[in-house]
Swiss-Prot record:
Gene designation per UniProt: yciB
Periplasmic domain ranges by topology: 1-21, 71-75, 142-148
GO cellular-component term (any): plasma membrane
Membrane topology listed for this record: Multi-pass membrane protein
Cited PANTHER family: INNER MEMBRANE-SPANNING PROTEIN YCIB, INTRACELLULAR SEPTATION PROTEIN A-RELATED
This protein's record includes keyword Cytoplasm: no
Subcellular location field: Cell inner membrane
Protein name: Inner membrane-spanning protein YciB
Transmembrane spans: 22-42, 50-70, 76-96, 121-141, 149-169
Keyword field: Cell inner membrane, Cell membrane, Membrane, Transmembrane, Transmembrane helix, Virulence
Length: 179
């Protein structure tokens, strides 16, 4: 259910873009993200930090897009989110000395410290590369290609990278945890 809720604003954005335009899609994205946030709070009595950060950025960049009638703001939102994620991962590893991935998953998984560090760094690099790809596609290719990349390309890349991370984790799990 939670995964569906995470993707709902993206689906709404895509549908409104195809039916109307980028500005209607942006307004719909703001509303859908707010509804998902409210529903999460009412249903689960919890809102994850990532969801809250994403909501704030959607409202800020979406609001700027609508106010100035300029789609560049909503295009930048994707890169800013990825930069924040990458930054949080890198700060957790290099400043706080405990990778964020480890903080999030250590209750469920037992892995050697170097594996946590490599996994954390890999996700940081992944987010940086996705942010850079977004900049290129958003500002050098037509808007419709960017929307398709945002909805399908980044989603597919994230699913593939998650699968690869799962394989990497499985290879380094203690034998007793694999069963």
């Amino acid at each position: 259910m939670k995964q569906f809720l995470d993707f709902l604003p993206l689906v709404v954005f895509f549908a409104f873009y195809k039916i109307y335009d980028i500005y209607a899609a942006t307004a719909a994205l703001i509303v859908a993200t707010a509804i998902v946030l409210i529903y999460s709070w009412v249903r689960f009595r919890k809102v994850e930090k990532m969801a809250l950060i994403t909501f704030v950025l959607v409202v800020v960049f979406g609001g700027l897009t609508l106010f100035f009638h300029n789609d560049e703001f909503i295009k930048w939102k994707v890169t800013v989110i990825y930069a924040l994620f990458a930054g949080a991962l890198l700060v957790s590893q290099w400043v706080m000395k405990k990778p964020l991935i480890q903080r999030m998953l250590s209750k469920e998984l037992t892995l050697p410290q170097p594996v946590w560090s490599k996994l954390n760094l890999a996700w940081a690099v992944f987010f940086i590369l996705c942010g850079l790809a977004n900049i290129y596609i958003a500002f050098w290719l037509p808007q419709n290609i960017w929307v398709n990349f945002k909805v399908f390309g980044l989603t597919a890349l994230t699913l593939i990278f998650t699968l690869l991370s799962g394989i990497y984790i499985y290879r380094h799990m203690p034998q007793e945890d694999k069963s």
